[in-house]
Each structure stands twice: as structure tokens, then as C-alpha cells.
């Protein structure tokens, strides 16, 4: 199916809640058009505008667009083989030249991650209205960034980092989709305990909201790209690595049952996906290395 982004617009809900909406038109096989959008809460990410390469934000916008498409198109209804969907996407995005140069890598990466057939093309867009964020030392002193989903592996990753780096300060990167409230609740419960034991050793803001305006598909295979896109913004500013804490068994997701064959298994932290994404981060001139310290471990 043919898909194109149509506009970028900013809305202000409060002084500290400005949201970027990227509108998307999805043309279904029958010719009907679904209008969806990717909604990104800009606080606190707007603080880093002008402080890191622009390509860092383009990667965030790309991940949000992919997530919105992934969540808006039902697999069962629109797959070509019972699982995989075909997406021909025209993406209007800042810094499009760099993404266009590496579109083959991006299409390969997305197709492996979600189990779909992605054919993305990148074109320029009108400039996004600037967002002013007050200067702050809040993000200074960060020595590491770790994905923090609220699951057991991300909990262990945070604890290990703070235990092994007593003089360090870790940023726990989280994502929030209001259509899926479970992870945010888990994150909040864990942080209550962190405040007692690791006060001053970590930084965790309320999970950054990125969600589609339509929520029909729940497999969410593209979610990890968005997690990492959020993390790389902070890591690019702090000039540190990104820890992706996931035990090796889950990363590889062995096909131990028929339901886990091929792309039915999640590939969110699969070594192939992380290697492809690392190459993309490098060619875009961004800083962080992606590190999974538990790649050769299991629970």
C-alpha cells in the first residue's frame, strides 16, 4: 500500500507540553485513505535542539513515523502472506539527503525488524517551527544511557550500571503510548524503589509520549527502534554509549514453537538488527555505540 507523510505541526497543551504531530495518509488496496499521525511529546527532547546533530532528530521522526504506520495497519487484514505487509512510503523529513543516501540500509533494517516489506523514499519538508526550551544543567553529568522498559532485563541493566559505576549518572530512556499503559505503570513502580536506594545516581523523566492517532495493530514490532531513537538523542548530547539490556535468549528468540517461526518472533534486540542500526547511526555521524551486556547470557 502507498503511504506518505503530509505535514508537520506543533500544538501547545501547556507550558511544558508541546507536541509535534506528523500527519500520514495511508492508501489502502481498495483506494480508500486512512488518515493517521505520529504524535511526539517534545518536552524534554526539545532541550537538545541545536546541541546535537540535526540527523539525530530526523532519526527520531523516522522512528515515530514507522511506529505510527506499524500500529495503524492491521496485519491480519492487510498482510500478503498472513503476516507481512507491503509499505511503499514517501517520507517528508528534515535532513532527508542523508536518509536518502542510505535508504537501502533503512529499508533492509525495517524489513528485518518488523517482518514486513518496506520501500521508503525520503524527500525534503518545510522547516519545523523552532521550540524554545529553557537552559538547564539538568542533563549535565550523564555518563550512560540505558533503555528502561519496566521489564526485568532493563531493571537488571539499570541496577548493574549504578552498582558498577558509583560515580556515574545514568539516564533511563522510556517511551509511553497511552494506548498501552502497562509499561509506564511498571516503570513508575520501579522508580519508587530506585529513589530509596540510588538517589542522585540516575535520571528518569516521565516516559516520553510517542503514539499513533490510530491504534489497530498490537504486535508493535517497531517499538524498539523508537526506544533507541529517544536514547540516542540523550547519548549524542552526553557522548556516551547506549545500553540495551536484554538476555541473549530473548534477543535471538529461538523458534521453539510454530508460533515463533520466522518473523513471528520479535527481533527488537536481535544482533542483526542492532548491527544494522549501529551502521546507520555511524553513517549519519551520530555518537553512541549500542551495547548489550547480556547478549551471551540468559535468565
Describe every region a protein language model picked out.
Residues 45-51, 175-298:
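ATP-dependent adenylate-handling ligase core
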Residues 1-146, 158-169, 173-208:
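RNA-binding accessory domains that recognize and position tRNA/RNA substrates
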Residues 146-152:
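Short, glycine-rich nucleotide/cofactor-binding loops
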Residues 149, 159-165, 230-239:
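Alpha-helix C-terminal capping segments
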Residues 153-157:
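Hydrophobic positions on the alpha1 helix immediately C-terminal to the Walker A/P-loop
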Amino acid at each position: 500500500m502507498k503511504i506518505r507523510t503530509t505535514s508537520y505541526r506543533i500544538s501547545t497543551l501547556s507550558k511544558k507540553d508541546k507536541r509535534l504531530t506528523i500527519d500520514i495518509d495511508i492508501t489502502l488496496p481498495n483506494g480508500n485513505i486512512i488518515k493517521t499521525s505520529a504524535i511526539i511529546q517534545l518536552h524534554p527532547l526539545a532541550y537538545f535542539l541545536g546541541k546535537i546533530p540535526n540527523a539525530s532528530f530526523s532519526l527520531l521522526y523516522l522512528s515515530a513515523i514507522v511506529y505510527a504506520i506499524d500500529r495503524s495497519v492491521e496485519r491480519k487484514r492487510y498482510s500478503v502472506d498472513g503476516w507481512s505487509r507491503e509499505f511503499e512510503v514517501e517520507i517528508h523529513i528534515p535532513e532527508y539527503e542523508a536518509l536518502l543516501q542510505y535508504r537501502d540500509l533503512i529499508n533492509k533494517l525495517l524489513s528485518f525488524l518488523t517482518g514486513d516489506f518496506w520501500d521508503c523514499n525520503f524527500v525534503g519538508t518545510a522547516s519545523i517551527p523552532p521550540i524554545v526550551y529553557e537552559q538547564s544543567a539538568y542533563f549535565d553529568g550523564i555518563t550512560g544511557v540505558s533503555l528502561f522498559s519496566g521489564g526485568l532485563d532493563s531493571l537488571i541493566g539499570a541496577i548493574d550500571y549504578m552498582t558498577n559505576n558509583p560515580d556515574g549518572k545514568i539516564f533511563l530512556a522510556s517511551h509511553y503510548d497511552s494506548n498501552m499503559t502497562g509499561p509506564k505503570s511498571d516503570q513508575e513502580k520501579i522508580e519508587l524503589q530506585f529513589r530509596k536506594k540510588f538517589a542522585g545516581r540516575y535520571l528518569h523523566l516521565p516516559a516520553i509520549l510517542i503514539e499513533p492517532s490510530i491504534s489497530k495493530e498490537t504486535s508493535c514490532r517497531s517499538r524498539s527502534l523508537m526506544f533507541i531513537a529517544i536514547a540516542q538523542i540523550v547519548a549524542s548530547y552526553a557522548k556516551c554509549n547506549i545500553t540495551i539490556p536484554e538476555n541473549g535468549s530473548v534477543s535471538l528468540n529461538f523458534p521453539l514453537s510454530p508460533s515463533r517461526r520466522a518473523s513471528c518472533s520479535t527481533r527488537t534486540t536481535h544482533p542483526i538488527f542492532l548491527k544494522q542500526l549501529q551502521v546507520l547511526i555511524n553513517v549519519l555521524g551520530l555518537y553512541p555505540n549500542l551495547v548489550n551486556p547480556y547478549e551471551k547470557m540468559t535468565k
